[in-house]
Amino acid sequence: MSDAAPDAVVPGAQYAQTQFNIDPSALTGISTIDDTTKQLANTLARIKDTFEYTPNLGPQKYGVAIHAAFAKAVRAQGLPGIAPPDVETTFGGDRYGVKGSVRTDVILRNDVGDVVAIYDVKTGEKGIEPKRAAELRLKAGVGNEVPIIQMSFPYGLSRKNAILEGSFSVQTF
């Protein structure tokens, strides 16, 4: 079979999963982080393909369902540098919801246990603001050298930066 005469399309068949656009800003040049970013993007794409947004579900419940399924899938994968407690980790309090606490979706650690990347899933239109990126870094006890990688349905994957002199973010539109 050649490209000139492709196979017939079968109605109702699924041919490819959702693919996330990975903005170049989401890639760090560090293979451990970049390989994990790609694996997590594929995992989130598979999760997205299993959930259909319906108006009666509402955006908040849809987001909760996606986050829960993604967390379960990431824990089950056993990816290097991501232990089960590194998924939906709460910083700044004993439990999620405590005043002043923050929750990260996924933390990636190096071989000695240092946080080397923070991943945040977004299912709606709102992305990570520079103030939120700074708060995540502060509560996780890391500096600006640790990338915060936004995994967003509307915008793909992008990296968030917070600089002491000011703030900016890189978005894929």
Label each region the model flagged.
Residues 2-173:
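Catalytic toxin/effector domains delivered as secreted proteins or via bacterial secretion systems
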